[in-house]
């Protein structure tokens, strides 16, 4: 351990976070949970019940491993200034800008997809809300409306400031979960074939693997959450991340199992669309989806802005971002994402490729590989034994290899879908 050099900041440079346990968990969970939860019952039609559940649990474990290694890297950096670029400074300094660009592109793409969902759903919901004017039946109207709603939220500097909108998003999600659970309990659905133990086919299983693998992506906000927490102890940070992952896992399992058992092989890519569209409760469910994705947009804008700033300024932390840079970059993200959403009605395949590369890179490859090399260069602030370090490094290497395999698999799956 004598060759290690702990990183520390001077007393005047110490950053004290203000975020508590609840707001940190809420923001991480809201970054994880999205409209993708509604496609899980359909994914189970390919995996079967048992393998679907096992895949959710394994994906949650792999995602938590990535978060754990992120927290281990953050513990070796000056408090409040942790980022992927800051870790890269001590491992692959020439690639720091590539890492930031990858995160920015991934978050930008997801943000655009949220706006496309708003534009697709609101014209369907508008007549039920008494908005029958032709203006309200155009997707462009609602995307522009979203711009006015999201602008003040996107300009907030701290992730912790978004805790209230994150709570609203999770309430909307819980309403969607309630709809699925209620119809499962009363048993008023038409069921297809249900596979309990055997997947439909090997290719069928692999074709829906991205739904599970990318279902727990929140690592782009992990450093921001860590930088803003009031209690910087490793135990507190890890428990915060574990709580977000386990809560999301339970919700995923609940919707996936009850939705699949309700419809079997008939389950569609959006489980809410399977219910009576004339029901006020289902219309409310569609509105809940809009609320969910709308308030998830700022959670993509925040890491996108930080990564763009770090890439432009060759900075290893967005902590020192000036008000001018903050305003200009935020405005550019808002204008470009909304413009792209107005121009394109479907980003399915583009996002599939961005997800295959970006999500895998951020969730598995970066945390695993950066921790593996960083832990050789910078001492842990704790008292890890040589054995503990060897085990951690083995898991980190395994996570990076797993991420690489998943990336190759998912890219091949997307290419196969294109050829069909």
From Swiss-Prot:
Pfam families: Aa_trans (PF01490). Keywords: Amino-acid transport, Membrane, Sporulation, Transmembrane, Transmembrane helix, Transport, Vacuole. It is a multi-pass membrane protein. One of its GO terms (biological process) is L-lysine transmembrane import into vacuole. Residues 1-19, 71-96, 163-166, 217-240, 300-326, 371-394 are cytoplasmic. GO terms for molecular function: L-arginine transmembrane transporter activity; L-glutamate transmembrane transporter activity; L-histidine transmembrane transporter activity; L-lysine transmembrane transporter activity; L-serine transmembrane transporter activity; L-tyrosine transmembrane transporter activity. Residues 41-49, 118-141, 188-195, 262-278, 348-349, 416-420 are vacuolar. The chain crosses the membrane at residues 20-40, 50-70, 97-117, 142-162, 167-187, 196-216, 241-261, 279-299, 327-347, 350-370, 395-415. GO terms for cellular component: fungal-type vacuole membrane. InterPro entries: AA_transpt_TM. It is found in: Vacuole membrane. Its main location: membrane. Belongs to the amino acid/polyamine transporter 2 family. Vacuolar amino acid transporter involved in the vacuolar uptake of histidine, glutamate, tyrosine, arginine, lysine, and serine. Required for sporulation. This is Vacuolar amino acid transporter 5. It comes from Schizosaccharomyces pombe (strain 972 / ATCC 24843) (Fission yeast).
């Amino acid at each position: 351990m004598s060759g290690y050099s702990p990183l520390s900041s001077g007393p005047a440079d110490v950053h004290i976070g203000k975020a508590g346990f609840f707001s940190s968990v809420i923001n991480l969970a809201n970054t994880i949970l999205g409209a993708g939860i509604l496609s899980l019952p359909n994914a189970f039609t390919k995996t079967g019940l048992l393998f679907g559940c096992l895949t959710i649990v394994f994906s949650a474990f792999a995602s938590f491993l990535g978060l754990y290694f992120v927290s281990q890297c953050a513990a070796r950096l000056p408090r409040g200034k942790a980022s992927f670029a800051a870790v890269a400074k001590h491992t692959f300094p020439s690639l720091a800008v590539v890492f930031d660009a990858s995160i920015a592109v991934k978050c930008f793409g997801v943000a655009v997809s949220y706006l496309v969902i708003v534009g697709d759903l609101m014209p369907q919901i508008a007549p039920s809300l008494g908005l029958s004017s032709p203006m309200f039946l155009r997707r462009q109207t609602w995307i522009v409306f979203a711009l006015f709603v999201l602008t003040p939220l996107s300009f907030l500097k701290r992730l912790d400031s978004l805790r209230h909108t994150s709570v609203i998003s999770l309430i909307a999600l819980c309403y969607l979960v309630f709809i699925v659970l209620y119809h499962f309990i009363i048993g008023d659905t038409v069921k297809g074939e249900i596979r309990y133990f055997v997947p439909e086919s090997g290719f069928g299983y692999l074709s829906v693997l991205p739904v599970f693998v990318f279902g727990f992506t929140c690592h782009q906000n992990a450093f921001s959450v860590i930088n803003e927490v009031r209690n910087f102890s490793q135990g507190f940070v890890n428990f915060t991340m574990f709580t977000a992952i386990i809560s999301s896992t339970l919700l995923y399992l609940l919707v996936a199992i009850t939705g699949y058992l309700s419809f079997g092989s008939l389950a569609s890519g959006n489980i809410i669309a399977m219910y009576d569209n004339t029901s006020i409760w289902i219309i409310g469910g569609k509105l809940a989806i809009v609320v969910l994705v709308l308030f998830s947009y700022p959670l993509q804008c925040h890491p996108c802005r930080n990564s763009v700033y770090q890439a432009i300024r060759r900075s290893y932390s967005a902590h020192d971002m000036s008000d001018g840079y903050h305003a200009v970059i935020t405005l550019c993200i808002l204008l470009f994402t909304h413009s792209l959403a107005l121009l394109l009605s479907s980003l399915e395949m583009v996002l599939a490729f961005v997800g295959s590369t970006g999500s895998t890179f951020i969730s598995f490859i970066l945390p695993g590989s950066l921790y593996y090399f960083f832990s050789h260069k910078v001492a842990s602030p704790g008292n890890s034994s040589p054995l503990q370090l060897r085990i951690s490094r083995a898991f980190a290497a395994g996570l990076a290899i797993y991420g690489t395999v998943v990336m190759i698999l998912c890219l091949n799956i997307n290419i196969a879908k294109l050829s069909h």
